[in-house]
């Protein structure tokens, strides 16, 4: 096994770990949503904090889940065309799309850092009374999520390149 393959495998193990944690966030989100519905319709009461917790849980699910989805090939692909390509062309497309994903990740990380730092500097919280006060923590997940997406895209690029090179 080459060092590049070991790196790609190590990234996969890490992303799978993150994916398992993200799955538990999904379970927590389902519980919170169920409790909110029960409180609202069963007891005619609600909690702003619990409502905000729903999207505080949804954000890491989306931001961390996109790397897990990429790892397991669950991202969107135009299979009508892709299915007819040779394996070598599929690998080439994999390399190109991984590089594009990495570039987009770098752009999002770069653009979000000042946004996150500003949020931390002002101690940004919710405008809703009784809501979750530490919104800056949630915003910090944006560059983290795209960093995870970057490293998983790197693993995909490595694998596609090695397959493309060996098929040539």
Report the location of each language-model feature.
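Alpha-helical transmembrane segments and membrane-interface helix-loop junctions
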Residues: 1-168
């Amino acid at each position: 096994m080459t060092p590049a393959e070991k790196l790609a495998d190590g990234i996969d193990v890490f992303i799978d770990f993150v994916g398992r944690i993200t799955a538990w966030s999904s379970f927590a989100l389902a519980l919170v949503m169920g409790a909110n519905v029960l409180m609202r319709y069963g007891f005619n009461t609600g909690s702003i904090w619990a409502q905000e917790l729903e999207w505080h849980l949804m954000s890491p699910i989306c931001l961390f889940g996109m790397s897990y989805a990429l790892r397991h090939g669950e991202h969107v692909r135009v299979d009508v065309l892709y299915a007819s390509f040779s394996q070598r062309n599929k690998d080439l497309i994999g390399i190109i799309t991984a590089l594009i994903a990495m570039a987009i990740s770098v752009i999002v990380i770069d653009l979000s850092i000042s946004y996150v730092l500003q949020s931390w500097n002002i101690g940004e919280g919710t405008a809703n009374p009784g809501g979750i006060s530490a919104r800056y923590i949630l915003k910090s997940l944006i560059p983290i999520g795209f960093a995870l997406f970057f490293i998983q895209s790197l693993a995909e690029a490595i694998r596609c390149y090695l397959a493309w090179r060996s098929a040539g």
